Amino acid sequence: MLPRHSCSLLLFLLLLPSVPMEPQPPSSTLPPFLAPEWDLLSPRVALSRGTPAGPPLLFLLEAGAYGEPAGAPANRSRRGVSETAPASRRGELAVCDAVSGWVTDRRTAVDLRGREVEVLGEVPAAGGSPLRQYFFETRCKAESAGEGGPGVGGGGCRGVDRRHWLSECKAKQSYVRALTADSQGRVGWRWIRIDTACVCTLLSRTGRA
C-alpha cells in the first residue's frame, strides 16, 4: 500500500497536460563568437562588414609618436596602406623600410603548431549578416625598379658596415587570433602568424655575431 502523499503525487503527474516539445534548430557549423574572445583579439585584426577605412588606433598612436605619415592604398588586397618615413629629426633614417595595410584576401596561414590552416572569410554574428576578417600587416617594402639599395625587403640594412657584417631586411611575424579550419574541416579560433614588422638581421663576416 502506497502512502497517501505518494498516491496524490502519482495522480497529479498523470493528470498533467502533455507539453509539446518544439523542435530545436540545427546548430551552426561555425562556433559563435563568445564575448571572452574579444579579449584575445589583436588590434591588427578587425571583424567588420566592410574594409576598415584606416589603420588601427594603436598603430596611429605609434606612428604619430615616431612621425610616420599615412599614405595611399597600394592595391585591392591591401587597404589603408602607410609607409614608414624618416623621422622628424634631421638625418634620421629607418634601418629597414616597411609598408603596412589591411590584407583583405588572406586565405591560408600557419597556426601555433606549424600547420597550414584555412582562414575563413566570414565570422557568424548574432542577429545580422556575418562579419569578415581583416588583418593589418606590416611587411618589408619591396624593391621597386630604379629604387634599389639598402633598406628594402631582401636587401641589406641601411647604415650597416658591409665590410664586417652581412645584413638583410626580413619580415617579422607575430601570432593573432583568427577563425580558421584545419585540414580535417574542424572550425575553431586559432593563433595564426601574420607579418607585423620589418627588422634587420645581422651576420658577422668573420662567423662571430
From Swiss-Prot:
InterPro entries reported in the protein's UniProt record: Cystine-knot_cytokine, Nerve_growth_factor-like, Nerve_growth_factor-rel, Nerve_growth_factor_CS, Neurotrophin-4
Record propeptide residues: 22-79
Residues glycosylated per entry: 75
Entry keywords, A to Z: Cleavage on pair of basic residues, Disulfide bond, Glycoprotein, Growth factor, Secreted, Signal
Cellular component terms per the entry's GO annotation: axon; dendrite; extracellular region; extracellular space; synaptic vesicle
Disulfide bonds: 96-169, 140-198, 157-200
Tissue: Expressed in thymus, muscle, ovary, brain, heart, stomach and kidney. Expressed in both embryo and adult tissues.
Family matches, as SUPFAM superfamilies: Cystine-knot cytokines
Subcellular location: Secreted
Major localization listed first in the record, in broad terms: secreted
A Pfam match: NGF
Residues annotated as signal peptide: 1-21
Function field: Target-derived survival factor for peripheral sensory sympathetic neurons. May promote ameloblast differentiation and subsequent reduction in proliferation of ameloblasts.
Protein family per UniProt: Belongs to the NGF-beta family.
Name of the molecule in the record: Neurotrophin-4
